[in-house]
Design a protein with these regions (language model features):
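A domain-level signal for the structural core that forms small-molecule/cofactor-binding pockets
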Residues: 1-127
Length: 127
């Protein structure tokens, strides 16, 4: 299951932006893998109070989203989805800039994590 964890300044989460972010991140994966894949996407939005996030050794005044997408490693190497990691980084960045504004684009960090077979589980069973 594709799973996003997004850390963003708490103040950017105002009760209206959260559904937009969840939808946009889901759509980013669906744009790469297809609409059916989108229904599997999980999203966690994690608000970080402004005084608890720093860049360059000082507290940050910017939203600076840090996004991690994790799913099984094999999904990044499917022949029918060439250049999947690059496409996911691009689609995720575009999605976030679309919701948060273009001025945030240069600060968006996207990390793609591949989980090896046998390293995840569902309901107590290795999947």
């Amino acid at each position: 299951m594709p799973h996003f964890s997004m850390h963003i300044r708490e103040e950017a989460l105002d009760g209206t932006v959260e559904p937009k972010l969840i939808s946009a991140l889901t759509d980013a994966v669906a744009a790469v893998y297809g609409e059916e894949f989108g229904r599997l996407v999980g999203v966690d939005l994690i608000g970080v109070p402004q005084h608890r996030r720093g860049i360059g050794g000082v507290p940050s005044e910017t939203d600076a989203p840090l996004v991690t997408l994790s799913m099984r490693e094999a999904a990044y190497h499917l022949p029918e989805v060439p250049d999947a990691p690059a496409r996911l980084v691009r689609a995720t960045t575009d999605a976030l800039a679309g919701v948060l504004g273009e001025d945030v684009r240069e600060q968006i960090i996207v990390t793609i994590v591949g989980v090896p077979d046998g390293r995840t589980g569902v309901a107590g069973t290795v999947a």
